[in-house]
Design a protein with these regions (language model features):
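Positively charged n-region of N-terminal signal peptides that target proteins for export
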Residues: 1-6
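N-terminal mature ectodomain segment of secretory-pathway/periplasmic proteins
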Residues: 26-111
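A short, amphipathic edge element
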Residues: 27-28, 60-62, 136-148, 195-200
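Short, ordered beta-strand-loop transition motifs
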Residues: 70-76, 149-156, 208-211
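Gly/Pro-enriched, hydrophobic low-complexity segments
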Residues: 83, 94, 104-108, 114-117, ...
Length: 260
């Protein structure tokens, strides 16, 4: 009898130990979320319709093409080319996402014949007048924050993220819900230094495209101003064989055929 009881207890201990050994840490969850959000395939392309709606109801629409290229070392390159409306036509935005150091960002303003470098300190400012930020285009590096798993349900991991350099950002922390099946962040709540929630970014629709879970509708909300920006992604493609040479400054002025 004692031997049976001992065997049952041993089995229970082993099962608990086994489940603990497979439990993901907050850092591992965030790393997988970063991969799911920004690294699907070797490269990618999408058409984007951006709708900016002010609190009073005024609506502005922007249409652009986004390209992404993954380097073998984890670095990435992003190219955004604006097609409409007329005031942003032929404007281009280039990002070199660098692992372990500040990203490089350039904005081409054809109306002014001006190539503008976006300083690292400006990465969390408005992207072309929308409620999305420059940093949202290429993603925030997981290394910039301390991550804590604060809740786990059957469907999501809830992670609290605190910046390692509080003076470099406008938020005190943000809480993100990550889908346990796809590892896509579904909603992020941003809090200011007084503890008030002032911003939300949410994935409103997810589809499987070429085997990759893909956000096809996302929304950023400025809770202080009441402004809302919705991005609708279409014609999404992965592994299309993009050439890294198009992700250079010379193609800011001369957009490659891949975006036209």
């Amino acid at each position: 009898m004692n031997s049976v009881r001992f065997s049952i207890m041993l089995l229970m201990v082993l099962l608990v130990a086994s489940s603990m050994s497979y439990a993901l840490t907050a850092d591992e969850i965030i790393d997988q979320a970063n991969q799911a959000s920004y690294y699907s395939g070797k490269d990618g392309r999408a058409m984007v319709k951006m709708t900016i709606t002010a609190k009073g109801g005024d609506v502005r629409v922007r249409e652009f093409t986004q390209l992404r290229y993954n380097e073998e070392n984890g670095d990435q390159k992003f190219y955004t080319y604006f097609k409409a409306p007329a005031d942003v036509y032929k404007m281009a935005y280039l990002v070199w996402k660098n692992i372990g150091r500040d990203d490089d960002r350039w904005l081409w303003l054809p109306a002014l014949n001006l190539k503008k470098r976006i300083a690292p300190g400006d990465k969390r400012t408005s992207f072309v007048g929308s409620d999305f930020l420059y940093e949202d285009v290429s993603g925030r590096s997981p290394e910039e924050d301390v991550h804590t798993l604060v809740e786990e349900t059957d469907t999501v991991y809830r992670i609290d993220n605190v910046p390692k350099d509080p003076g470099s950002v406008e938020f005190s922390h943000y809480v993100v819900d990550i889908n346990k099946s796809t590892f896509l962040p579904m909603i992020a709540h941003y809090y200011d230094h007084r503890g008030n929630k002032y911003r939300e970014v949410e994935a409103l629709n997810v589809e499987e495209i070429q085997g990759f879970a893909t956000v096809t509708v996302s929304e950023a909300r400025d809770l202080a101003s009441g402004s809302v920006t919705r991005n609708e992604f279409s014609d999404v493609e992965y592994n299309i064989g993009l050439n890294s040479r198009i992700f250079t400054e010379r193609f800011l002025r001369r957009p490659p055929r891949e975006v036209q």
